């Protein structure tokens, strides 16, 4: 069985802790900034810049876990712990699975935002 794209308990806890309105502002900010985080990962991978790669993966991981995007967070954590020179390829696009999962997360967060 696949894990849900967004862990609803984590997302609801965020809303309870911060208030629904602020949680939705955080969602909007994440949806605006996450593509830059993914671009930073791609750029760092292309440049073999280990420090930038680790920082970008860490930022993505932390943000994902805040919203309950646990699968994407785990993928980012795996990248954070993997040296940039050891990132496995995937048909020449090693970050494609991460980008695909982000697309699912963005769609799920957008749907939750409009509930």
Regions found by a protein language model. Give the residues of each.
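Two-component system phosphorelay core
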Residues: 1-115
């Amino acid at each position: 069985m696949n894990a849900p794209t967004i862990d609803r308990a984590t997302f609801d806890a965020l809303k309870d802790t911060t208030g629904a309105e602020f949680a939705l502002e955080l969602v909007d900010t994440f949806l605006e900034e996450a593509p830059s985080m993914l671009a930073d990962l791609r750029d760092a991978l292309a440049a073999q810049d280990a420090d930038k790669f680790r920082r970008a993966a860490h930022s993505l991981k932390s943000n994902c876990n805040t919203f309950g995007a646990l699968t994407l967070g785990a993928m980012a954590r795996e990248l954070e712990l993997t040296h940039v020179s050891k990132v496995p390829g995937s048909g020449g696009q090693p970050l494609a699975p991460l980008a695909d999962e982000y697309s699912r997360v963005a769609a799920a967060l957008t749907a939750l935002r409009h509930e």
